[in-house]
A protein has these predicted regions:
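Short, conserved sequence motifs used for protein processing/export or organelle targeting and
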Residues: 195-198, 203, 207-364
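Sequence context of c-type cytochrome heme-c attachment sites
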Residues: 30-194
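Bacterial N-terminal signal peptides
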Residues: 17-26
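Beta-rich carbohydrate-recognition modules and glycan-binding surfaces
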Residues: 1, 16-17
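A short, structural micro-pattern
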Residues: 3-4, 136-139, 198, 283
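Short Gly/Ser/Thr- and charged-rich N-terminal loops/segments
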Residues: 13
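A broad structural signal for short, well-ordered beta-strand segments within beta-sheet-rich domains
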Residues: 2, 140, 333-337
Length: 364
């Protein structure tokens, strides 16, 4: 009983000290007191490597908004998703786990530094990311991108922290960060970036937001709002940001009583990688060319598929032309509409993320 009371008093005493320090830091502009508080390293266990790492849920106690975004992202489900489980024959292929449940991407950075290879780390020979064998359900978790080999959490900002913290703004704002796992897409990016478009992966897939890094008490009182990024990692945010990233256009339409023929022109206008992109998994983009009657019913249709494996993807700045011919039936005198739809799909056609759509009214 005495031991329990002593522990309670210690916790209360530390909490009281922190409250006083927080108030003083706020009043003084957070200068000296911020440095003092950070140097105290109150929770070093948060930055433990290996099985001792407490898990992303622990990070979510303070980084509430970021954790919620990550929890709803595909990164958090990179190991537990049915697609990954089936594709790896129930996790038989360990090579894939290195990126779907990494210890930390800095194992690759460490290897690159030791070998003194002066190239982007994603191209460093014999470098690799180490796979976790613990807490696999978290997939690409917080430590995967933020925990260094020196047991420090790194990121683009500095500030008050109860755990070791290292600022690395340049790396966290570069596509090289994402390229440690998304190797093939990053190589495409290196090939095409600079041709009038210098946007990084983060610019499109991590929407900008101004907020405090943490929302929990009392730490949030020591933080000011900063420009940051949402941790959603979504293709939908990229589409929302660049609504005309790919353009569809009907050209050379030949319209008569017997048939309608023409072309659909596709241009990858604003993306620094191919559409689709990536080496692993089922990645398909579908083009549907539909002929509709005056009631909106599809009476004729043609489908074109684009795969990286077949080298039919649309590269940055590339224009592809797909021809179509629709023979007309006895309703050819009715008003019809041509429609072209471009969307991402998966193997069982449950994913139909719309990329672009164009319509052309026809008078017969």
């Amino acid at each position: 009983m005495i031991h329990k009371l002593t522990g309670t008093r210690t916790i209360l005493r530390i909490s009281g000290v922190l409250a006083v320090v927080a108030i003083m830091a706020t009043l003084s502009g957070c200068g000296l007191f911020q440095k003092m508080l950070t140097s105290m390293n109150i929770h070093p266990e948060l930055a433990e490597r290996g099985e001792k790492f407490p898990g992303s849920y622990k990070c979510g106690h303070c980084h509430i908004d970021i954790y919620k975004e990550w929890e709803g992202s595909t990164h958090s489900k990179s190991y537990t998703s049915d697609k990954f489980r089936i594709a790896t024959n129930n996790y038989e292929y360990g090579f894939c786990i290195r990126c779907h449940a990494p210890k930390t991407i800095f194992t690759l950075l460490e290897k690159e530094t030791v070998d003194n290879i002066d190239v982007p780390v994603t191209q460093a020979k014999n470098s690799e990311i180490a796979a976790r064998d613990y807490n696999l359900k978290d997939g690409v978790d917080c430590q995967g991108c933020h925990l260094t080999v020196d047991c420090e959490f790194s990121g683009p900002h500095e500030g008050i922290s109860p755990h070791p913290l290292k600022k690395d703004e340049e790396f966290y704002k570069s596509s090289e960060l994402c390229g440690t796992c998304h190797v093939d897409t990053f190589e495409e990016y290196l090939t095409y970036v600079g041709n009038g478009n210098d946007e990084t992966c983060q610019d499109c897939h991590m929407p900008a937001v101004r907020r405090k890094l943490i929302q929990d008490e009392p730490w949030q009182k020591l933080h000011k709002k900063k420009e940051g990024k949402k941790h959603t990692f979504s293709r939908l945010s990229a589409i929302e940001k660049n609504k005309d990233f790919v353009r569809l256009k009907f050209t050379e339409i030949n319209n008569n009583n017997d048939q309608i023929a023409g072309n659909v022109e596709i241009i990858n206008t604003k993306v620094n990688h191919s559409i689709p992109t990536g080496k692993y998994g089922y990645r398909e983009v579908l083009l549907l060319i539909n002929l509709k009657d005056n009631l909106g019913k599809i009476i004729k249709s043609k489908q074109e598929s684009m795969f990286v494996e077949l080298n039919t993807q649309i590269k940055p700045g590339e224009k592809k032309i797909y021809s179509f011919v629709f023979d007309l039936d006895d309703k050819s005198g009715e008003l019809k509409e041509l429609e072209a739809v471009l969307f991402r799909s998966n193997f069982n056609r449950t994913d139909k993320t719309l990329f672009a759509k164009v319509e052309l009214q026809l008078g017969l």
